[in-house]
Swiss-Prot record:
Name recorded for this polypeptide: Alpha-tubulin N-acetyltransferase
Binding-site residues, acetyl-CoA: 120-133, 156-165
Domain N-acetyltransferase per the UniProt entry, residue ranges: 1-186
Site keyed Crucial for catalytic activity: positions: Q57
EC number(s) on file: 2.3.1.108
Region feature Disordered, mapped onto this chain: 204-254, 335-359, 385-432
The organism's place on the tree of life at top rank: Eukaryota
Taxonomic lineage from the root: Eukaryota, Metazoa, Ecdysozoa, Arthropoda, Hexapoda
Gene3D superfamilies: 3.40.630.30
Xref: HAMAP family: mec17 (MF_03130)
Biased composition (Low complexity): 204-215
Length: 446
């Protein structure tokens, strides 16, 4: 894989190791600008090869990127092939330590921090030429580890065949995650030191933790030490059993003292030798509450039948008298009502004791009209409405007679002044109902 920049200054060796500083081992920069340029070039190389490795493995996202390497303690080994131009980068190998939960040969889950192969890729044009084994051997020598002590992350078929061919790794230990481990993984010195003290005992029953039952000793635990620890924990957990007093000692003690002592005892500590029913009766006797049995309910009188709801009561006469008085008051009010009081309207009689509702001017719509003005502008039998043609929605032309003429011809006599004329308006200015006759153009409401 050739790049646009010259790779020879970056690769002083055939295989270089790169950590989270994104600078190859053995690289020296004369100035800060040179170091920044080298970091940018190494980042471009890692991102490009990581994308090719993901495509070869059928992954949607690359496993190896420069950003992931900067935020971790993993290592990347890059293989370089010099030429007359910028040089070629032909392979990549990413390794690092991870904390894993894996199954051992006995099926027990253990937590180990083991070296892992996270990404391994050689360009297709350079495969089957021994470059992959050269890169892998260089990594084993640098990390000082054995092939069987490695955990492989999502190995492809080619990688599994590569390990079988060159290192004889055939027998795999089944795991529940994406890592593959081989026999000999737990027997190595490095992984064995990480396993100590972190072995997990998984049982099918969950009551062992709640009942303080101890798990059986594992294969790596000494039986004598387990028995000593088991006996010591029982000595610490089990409380001392209370000693029972002889009946001769209790005969000389008064009953009041015994009952007081029983009340002060904790129920959890005295549950082995104190009868709960006897203690319950003592508590009721102390507080003065006695238990009532079913035989004591015989003296309770039986409930009598409900009285007749329709029986006569003297209060009914008072209600009838009040209703009759209210009806009489309503009749007198209707007879004494004057036509001048517009605010008072006739209301229907109420059969019950409720008072009639009084309607005000606000309810009737005559809020802005006085008594005289309301009668003057209210349409009466003397007013005629004449609309000879359609003048639009809501427009009504009112033609009122001139003087005392009540004929149809007087409406078109040539006088356009429209007025309201009532009887006796020339002399007494009073209508036949006793109201003042006001012209519509004299009223401020018009």
């Amino acid at each position: 894989m050739e790049f646009r920049f010259n790779c020879h200054p970056l690769f002083r060796q055939r295989i270089v190791r790169i950590n989270n500083s994104l600078l190859p081992t053995g690289f020296t920069a004369p100035c800060r600008r040179t170091a920044l340029d080298a970091t940018a070039q190494i980042s471009e190389i890692i991102n490009f090869i990581g994308q090719l490795s993901a495509q070869a493995q059928g992954l949607s996202n690359p496993v190896t990127t420069s950003q992931k390497l900067r935020n971790s303690d993993h290592h990347i080994y890059l293989m370089f092939e010099p030429n007359e131009k910028h040089g070629l980068v032909v392979g990549i190998l990413k390794v690092g330590h991870k904390s894993l939960y894996v199954f051992d040969q006995n099926g027990e889950t253990v937590n180990v921090t083991a070296p892992c192969v996270l990404d391994f890729y050689v360009h297709e044009s350079r495969q089957r030429g021994g470059l992959g084994r050269e890169l892998f051997e260089h990594m084993l020598n640098e990390e000082k580890i054995q092939p069987q002590s490695l955990a492989i992350d999502r190995p492809s078929g080619k990688l599994l065949g590569f390990l079988q061919k060159h290192y004889g790794l055939y027998n795999k230990i089944p795991q529940m995650n994406n890592f593959v481990v081989y026999e000999g993984f737990f027997s190595s010195k490095q992984n064995g030191s990480d396993i100590d003290g972190r072995r997990m005992h998984i049982t099918a029953s969950t009551s062992s933790s709640t009942n303080n039952h101890h798990a059986p000793p594992s294969a790596s635990t000494n039986n004598n030490e387990y028995e000593n620890n088991h006996a010591t924990s029982h000595d610490l957990e089990e409380p001392a059993a209370p000693q029972e007093e002889s009946p001769q000692d209790n005969e000389d003690v008064p009953e009041e003292v015994l009952s007081a002592n029983l009340q002060n005892l904790n129920m959890a500590d005295a549950s082995d030798y104190v009868d709960y029913h006897h203690h319950h009766q003592l508590q009721h006797a102390k507080s003065g509450h006695e238990v009532t049995f079913a035989d004591d309910y015989g003296e309770i009188p039986e409930p009598t039948a409900d009285p007749d709801p329709y029986t006569f009561h003297p209060h009914h006469l008072e209600l009838q008298n009040q209703q009759e008085q209210q009806k009489q008051m309503m009749i007198n009010r209707e007879n004494s009502a004057s036509p001048q009081s517009i605010s008072q309207q006739h209301t229907p009689e109420h059969p019950g004791p409720r008072k009639p509702i009084r309607y005000t001017k606000q309810h009737t719509g005559l809020k802005n009209m006085s008594s005289g003005v309301g009668a003057a502008v209210t349409p009466s039998a003397k007013m005629e409405f004449d609309q000879e043609e359609n003048e639009g929605f809501g427009s009504v032309k009112i033609n009122r007679p001139i003087g005392k003429s009540n004929t149809r011809n007087s409406l078109h006599s040539g006088d356009d002044n429209e007025s309201v004329h009532s009887k006796g308006s020339d002399s007494s200015h009073m209508t036949e109902h006793g109201h003042f006759d006001l012209k519509f153009y004299h009223n401020k409401l018009w």
